[in-house]
A protein has these predicted regions:
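Secretory targeting and sorting signals
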Residues: 1-32
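Feature targets compositionally biased, intrinsically disordered low-complexity regions
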Residues: 5-10, 53-56, 101, 110-111
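Intrinsically disordered, low-complexity, compositionally biased regions/tails
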Residues: 10, 14-15, 88, 172-175
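A generic structural signal for short, solvent-exposed coil/turn residues
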Residues: 22, 90-91, 111, 252
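N-terminal module-boundary/linker segments of secreted carbohydrate-active enzymes
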Residues: 28-102, 266-271
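A broad, low-specificity signal for short, low-complexity segments enriched in glycine/proline
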Residues: 57-61, 104-111, 229
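Short, His- and charge-rich active-site/binding loops that engage polyanionic ligands
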Residues: 96-98, 102-116
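Domain-level detector of nuclease and nuclease-like folds
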Residues: 112-271
Length: 271
């Protein structure tokens, strides 16, 4: 009788072990999903944005400009290491996630060679002709790691829907004067463009950057298309990867924030 109870107990133990093994993943997906991150606590957000509360339109835009203009500025060479932190793959700390392709790639594989990643200015640096100078040219809130070839294809094009598929970067499309990023980062792109329009208002010796509703802006300090960007912002709200990025920039590098990640409703309040 005791031997029978032991056999039953052993069978239960083996079954439990099998269930436990089945519940533990043996590998990680090659395309990492966003992981939870600590957003700015409500009390801290209230303090940071206190002077902007209750405002709309140009008054809100001006108040946010005053707030986010208080920042630490990086050199262009410092951006390499910073992007390794801001865009770190949450499942592999040795890698970054490339903006347009979504590929996870070694932090050390950056430069100008085919297959490397480089520093993409989401607000194209020729739109306002600020180049890579400290300021808009080195602002982490719109700099992202991207594949060298895909970055070249995007060039300084405005953002819009449509075009032909970009080889090697599924979900991205381009034509002669515009670029459409993959769905998972459309809102990210929109919020980066709108951050730049609030942060750089013709002060500090740089152009007044503004969104408009056209493509082919060239070297003018405008970026399109605002109607499409607002649609992308609505359809792709901030996820945990984007919120974590905002935290890293604020806490470890620039000490300023992208308000449209923290308060998405402010896009409609201004535009």
């Amino acid at each position: 009788m005791s031997r029978s109870r032991g056999s039953v107990a052993g069978g239960i133990a083996l079954a439990a072990a099998a269930l436990l093994a089945a519940a533990v993943p043996t590998s990680v997906s090659a395309a990492p999903a966003p992981v939870p991150s600590a957003a700015l606590p409500a009390s801290s957000a209230d303090t940071y944005y206190a002077s902007a509360e209750g405002k709309t339109g140009t008054a809100l835009k001006a108040a946010l400009n005053d707030i986010i203009s208080e920042q630490t500025r990086l050199s262009y060479s410092q951006v390499w290491d910073a992007l390794g932190d801001t865009d770190e793959d949450p499942y592999d700390p040795d890698n970054v996630i490339l903006l347009y392709s979504g590929r996870s790639q070694s932090k050390s594989e950056h430069g100008g060679n085919l297959g490397d990643w480089n520093r993409e200015h989401v607000w194209a640096k020729s739109h306002g002709d600020f180049g890579t100078r400290t300021g808009p040219g080195t602002d982490l809130h719109h700099l992202r790691p991207t594949d060298v070839r895909v970055n070249s294809i995007r060039g300084n094009k405005d953002f819009d829907n449509g075009g032909s598929a970009v080889s090697g970067a599924p979900g991205n499309y381009t034509d002669g004067d515009s670029f459409e990023p993959r769905d998972a980062v459309k809102g990210d792109v929109a919020r980066m463009i709108l951050y730049m329009a609030v942060r750089y208002e013709g002060e500090d010796g740089f152009a007044d950057l503004e969104p408009n509703d056209r493509v082919g802006n060239g070297s003018a300090p405008y970026h399109g298309r605002i109607g499409v960007l607002k649609q992308w912002h609505r359809e792709d709200p901030p996820d945990s990867f984007e919120r974590n990025r905002n935290e890293v920039i604020y806490n470890e590098y620039q000490r300023n924030r992208n308000p449209f990640i923290d308060r998405p409703e402010w896009v409609e309040a201004i535009w």
